[in-house]
């Protein structure tokens, strides 16, 4: 195999980016992605992202394979890295501010690279009905807000949000005390979530400042999750715990999230940085 790649990271959530613009099919298989993401015997990453040709009236298409070979609908930190990758491939100066329409399995997502190196992403509207998550915690046409869920021998109050991929959010007094390695898989594989679930544990420091830890479906514990931070802010607003705009602090650093009102899109702003280039 001789395939160029570039590694990017967004708040420590790291990805191998592949220039796939000349082929509509990913240049690597899910099985190859698992090997390449291995941090001991491969390059090491949370996932492999492919920049593919446009679909319909978009600029590019995004596909991603997680480190376990599964394919999520979307990845918030990943799409910021993809936008920075596209801008770099197109030869834009670091001060340029290109805006892209990216086709994903979750729909069209619109990131804009900013002159300060940050990327702001229009993540679209959150989906709140149980059938859209999906989850069996409530009837398909009802919202799942502060619903009890039995996990690990205790009852958790959970709120479910889809940002194109499924999230289960619970609010805790001390997020640092959560045994994520034990609870994460139990939430992810709970029978109430037929497509598995991303799980966010949130500590509300102030109405405009949330601390979060995440267990990602297919990737495990990561330093950051962009869609998870968006889902967390939405859940906090729905539970009257947060203002419409807040900083979500993750182990890898902060994201700025805004959801002005139900029916409106969620905006996410955060960094995306190139780490190194290589050849597989």
UniProtKB/Swiss-Prot annotation:
Catalysed reaction, written as an equation: (2S,6S)-2,6-diaminopimelate = meso-2,6-diaminopimelate
Signal sequence span per UniProt? none
> Which InterPro entries does this entry report, sorted A to Z?
DAP_epimerase_AS (IPR018510), DAP_epimerase_DapF (IPR001653)
What SUPFAM superfamilies does the record tag this protein with?
Answer: Diaminopimelate epimerase-like
Pathway listed for it is: Amino-acid biosynthesis; L-lysine biosynthesis via DAP pathway; DL-2,6-diaminopimelate from LL-2,6-diaminopimelate: step 1/1
Ranges annotated as spanning the membrane: none
Site Could be important to modulate the pK values of the two catalytic cysteine residues: list residues: 167, 216
rRNA-binding: present as a keyword of the record?
no
Binding-site positions, substrate: 13, 66, 76-77, 165, 198, 216-217, 226-227
One GO MF term attached to the UniProt entry: diaminopimelate epimerase activity
Q: What is its main location?
A: cytoplasm
Q: Quick one: a GO cellular component term?
A: cytosol
NCBIfam families, A to Z: DapF
How does this chain assemble?
Homodimer.
* Functional description taken from the UniProt entry: Catalyzes the stereoinversion of LL-2,6-diaminopimelate (L,L-DAP) to meso-diaminopimelate (meso-DAP), a precursor of L-lysine and an essential component of the bacterial peptidoglycan.
- Family as reported in the entry's similarity comment: Belongs to the diaminopimelate epimerase family.
UniProt protein name: Diaminopimelate epimerase
């Amino acid at each position: 195999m001789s395939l160029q790649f570039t590694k990017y990271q967004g708040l420590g959530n790291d990805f191998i980016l592949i220039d796939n613009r000349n082929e509509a099919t990913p240049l690597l298989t899910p099985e190859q992605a698992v090997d390449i993401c291995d941090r001991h015997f491969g390059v090491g990453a949370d996932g492999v992202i492919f920049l593919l040709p446009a679909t319909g009236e978009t600029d590019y298409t995004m596909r991603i394979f997680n480190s376990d070979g599964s394919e999520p609908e979307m990845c918030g930190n990943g799409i910021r890295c993809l936008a920075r990758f596209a801008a770099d491939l197109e030869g834009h100066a670091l001060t340029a501010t290109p805006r892209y329409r990216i086709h994903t399995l979750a729909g069209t997502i619109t990131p804009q690279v900013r002159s300060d190196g940050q990327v702001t992403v229009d993540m679209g509207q959150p989906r709140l009905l149980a059938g859209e998550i999906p989850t069996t915690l409530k009837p398909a046409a009802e919202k799942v807000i502060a619903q009890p869920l039995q996990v690990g021998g205790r009852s958790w109050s959970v709120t479910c949000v889809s940002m194109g991929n499924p999230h289960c959010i619970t609010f805790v007094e001390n997020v640092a005390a959560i045994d994520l390695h034990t609870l994460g898989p139990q939430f992810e594989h709970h029978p109430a979530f037929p497509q598995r679930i991303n799980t966010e544990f949130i500590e509300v420091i102030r109405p405009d400042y949330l601390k979060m830890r995440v267990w990602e479906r297919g990737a495990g514990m990561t330093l950051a999750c962009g869609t998870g931070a968006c889902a967390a802010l939405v859940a906090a607003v729905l539970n009257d715990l947060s203002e419409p705009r807040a900083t979500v602090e993750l182990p890898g650093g902060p994201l700025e999230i805004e959801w002005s009102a139900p029916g409106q899109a969620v905006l996410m702003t955060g960094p995306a940085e190139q780490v190194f280039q290589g050849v597989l």
